[in-house]
Swiss-Prot record:
There is a cross-link at K56, K159 (Glycyl lysine isopeptide (Lys-Gly) (interchain with G-Cter in SUMO)). Keywords: Cytoplasm, Developmental protein, DNA-binding, Isopeptide bond, Metal-binding, Nucleus, Repeat, RNA-binding, Transcription, Transcription regulation, Tumor suppressor, Ubl conjugation, Wnt signaling pathway, Zinc, Zinc-finger. It comes from Xenopus tropicalis. This is Wilms tumor protein homolog. It holds the Pfam family WT1. SUPFAM superfamilies: beta-beta-alpha zinc fingers. Residues 334-348, 360-368 are annotated as: Important for interaction with target DNA. PROSITE patterns: ZINC_FINGER_C2H2_1 (PS00028), ZINC_FINGER_C2H2_2 (PS50157). One of its GO terms (molecular function) is double-stranded methylated DNA binding. Transcription factor required for development of the vascular component of the pronephric kidney, the glomus; may repress tubule-specific gene expression in the portion of the pronephros fated to form the glomus. Recognizes and binds to the DNA sequence 5'-GCG(T/G)GGGCG-3'. Inhibits Wnt-signaling during embryonic development. The record marks K388, E394 as: Important for interaction with target DNA.
Length: 413
């Protein structure tokens, strides 16, 4: 299966034919292409949504979305203000909408993108596809589900939850929520207070980072959902009371990740989501079991907290701010903030045992100590040069000298 990316049309499960001979089946395209999948007017409240969210269509995928190896679960917790409004987007049969469904005068961001049929309102057939659930608190009740439904989400504080069961606080970072893929006019009257996002993606661990652009905003309707994620369980369970009806939303959200998988423990970076954890059963006893999954970065760490701090280099998150007057500098790590604040206070807690000189940073003391011991751990690697230095910056300057001399020699020749 590799790391191919499915067309969202192939990811939606097949549904039975309804009265009126309408059908919601979505075929796979016959050739690979990039295609927009949104249908939103350019005006508020969607003006902040990125207009360039695309999903690669690959004909190499089998159109059957029910492959066992794809049934892994992944949840992304959203918190933030719900800005979607009923009637903001259009729905209809796939292709052009029927005249009764079309809204006159409404501009489409992507004129050629598909419409979503309202067949989900009446669909009663069992849908046997593994889903990934995404919840957000559009109202103060996080992950709320109406009382007449089976609870799909339980209340959670917004903390990072690593796949092995640890719960460690992770600084909140704002991202633009990926735009919904399809949308319809309004939810049912009985479900107006229950918004959620559903990631309709069967996948394996190889293509996991592709998924966030495939989010859909939904409300829960009393219909059948054959395989649903229940309370962050490790496998899918049948739930005959809850099936989502599409609904549109947008805005800025605070994103958290929580991996829940069948057979593997694997969370990889997805666009717009904080780089998370990669940890498989074969790595459980390794010295550094936590590996960064940001594309191109495979650094490993002994502790989960160290990986979380490292991840902020990729996200740019700086949750620690200096509280001194007129200083608004921010840092990604608490020790960096503490070290910075010593500039304001003048505190120098590190003292040389030989000469009693004090320093505000331990690395400065370590470098200074070499002046007493004569240690020179930094060696020049230039051919035929054996010089050593006590400080790394001295080695850099020395190396630059070699480079300048080489340049002059080349120009002379």
């Amino acid at each position: 299966m590799g790391s191919d990316v499915r067309d969202m049309n192939a990811l939606l499960p097949p549904v039975s034919t309804l009265s009126g001979n309408s059908s919601c089946s979505m075929p796979v395209s016959s050739s690979g292409q990039w295609a927009p999948v949104l249908d939103f007017p350019p005006g508020a409240p969607y003006s902040s949504l990125p207009p360039h969210s695309f999903i690669k269509q690959e004909p190499t995928w089998n159109p059957d979305p029910h492959e066992d190896q794809c049934l892994s679960a992944f949840t992304v917790h959203f918190s933030g203000q719900f800005t979607g409004t009923a009637g903001a987007c259009r729905y209809g049969a796939f292709g052009a909408p029927t005249p009764s469904q079309a809204t006159t005068g409404q501009a489409r961001m992507f004129p050629n993108s598909p419409y979503l049929s309202n067949c989900l309102d009446n669909q009663q057939g069992m849908r046997n596809q593994g889903y990934s659930a995404v919840a957000f608190d559009g109202t103060p009740s996080y992950g709320h589900t109406p009382s007449h439904h089976t609870a799909q989400f339980t209340n959670h504080s917004f903390k990072h939850e690593d796949p092995m069961g640890q719960q460690t606080s992770l600084g909140e970072q704002q991202y633009s929520v990926p735009p919904p893929v399809y949308g319809c006019h309004t939810p049912t009257d009985s479900c107006t207070g229950s918004q959620a996002l559903l990631l309709r993606t069967p996948y394996n661990s190889d293509n996991l980072y592709q998924m966030t652009s495939q989010l859909e905003c939904m409300t829960w309707n009393q219909m059948n959902l054959g395989s649903s994620l229940k309370s962050h369980g490790t496998s899918y369970e049948n739930d005959s009371h809850s099936t989502p009806m599409l609904y549109s939303c947008g805005g800025q959200y605070r994103i958290h990740t929580h991996g829940v998988f069948r057979g593997i423990q694997d969370v990889r970076r997805v666009p717009g989501v904080t780089p998370a954890i990669v940890r498989s059963s074969t790595e459980a006893n390794e010295k550094r079991p936590f590996m960064c999954a940001y594309p191109g970065c495979n650094k490993r760490y002994f502790k989960l907290s160290h990986l979380q701090m490292h991840s902020r280099k990729h996200t740019g998150e700086k949750p620690y701010q200096c509280d001194f007057k007129d200083c608004e500098r921010r840092f990604s790590r608490s020790d960096q903030l503490k070290r910075h604040q010593r500039r304001h206070t003048g505190i120098k807690p590190f003292q040389c045992k030989t000469c009693q000189r004090k320093f505000s940073r331990s690395d400065h003391l370590k470098t200074h100590t070499r002046t007493h011991t004569g240690e020179k751990p930094f060696s020049c690697r230039w051919p035929s040069c054996q010089k050593k230095f006590a400080r790394s910056d001295e080695l850099v300057r020395h190396h630059n000298m070699h480079q300048r001399n080489m340049t002059k020699l080349q120009l002379a020749l």
